[in-house]
């Protein structure tokens, strides 16, 4: 247990950390085929960051997972809150067998439905439109449409008929 404790003098830990960072510079990954696109633009052959490599791979998945996780946790919290509110409203804890069929029927049907009465709105009204007839209605003769406002050489079909006569 004593071996896991930090030294009592804080000045001992700092030089060891500095030595670790100095010698760790030789252990950086060199640019290979899989890491070539993440290398610095300078002359050093070391990769800039593994976080950039991992970040490009996992960024979309991580964001979608975080959003899904937050929505899922909010749903669970809402469900628990609704359950607690229902229990508080009833002033009792929920137990198996408390809700019986008679209790459900009393909630759903507090009394007998009213007797059936004839609905006067369904009667045939005299102000309905006349029934559909297949005979075409007589339409008044229409005058031809006005000439096309664009190019004077273009004529509408009615003007072509008039011009041909």
Swiss-Prot record:
Topology feature Extracellular, residues: 30-61
Acetylation is among the record's keywords: no
Keywords tagged on the record: Membrane, Signal, Transmembrane, Transmembrane helix
Cytoplasmic side: 83-165
GO CC terms of this entry: membrane
One Pfam assignment: CYYR1
Ranges where the record places region Disordered: 125-165
Membrane topology: Single-pass type I membrane protein
Polar residues biased stretches: 154-165
Top-rank taxon: Eukaryota
Family statement drawn from the similarity comment of this UniProt entry: Belongs to the CYYR1 family.
PANTHER family: CYSTEINE AND TYROSINE-RICH PROTEIN 1
Name recorded for this polypeptide: Cysteine and tyrosine-rich protein 1
Organism of origin: Mus musculus
């Amino acid at each position: 247990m004593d071996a896991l404790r930090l030294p009592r003098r804080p000045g001992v830990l700092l030089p060891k950390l500095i030595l670790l960072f100095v010698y760790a510079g030789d252990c950086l990954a060199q640019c290979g085929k899989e890491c070539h696109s993440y290398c610095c633009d300078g002359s050093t052959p070391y990769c800039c960051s593994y976080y950039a490599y991992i970040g490009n791979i996992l960024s979309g998945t991580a964001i979608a997972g975080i959003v899904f996780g937050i929505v899922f946790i909010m749903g669970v919290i809402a469900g628990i809150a609704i359950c607690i509110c229902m229990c508080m409203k009833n002033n009792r804890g929920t137990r198996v067998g408390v809700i019986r069929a008679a209790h459900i029927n009393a909630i759903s049907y507090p009394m007998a439905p009213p007797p059936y009465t004839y609905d006067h709105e369904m009667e045939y009204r005299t102000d309905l439109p006349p029934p559909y007839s297949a005979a075409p209605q007589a339409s008044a003769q229409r005058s031809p449409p006005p000439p096309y406002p664009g190019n004077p050489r273009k004529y509408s079909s009615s003007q072509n008929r008039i011009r041909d006569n």
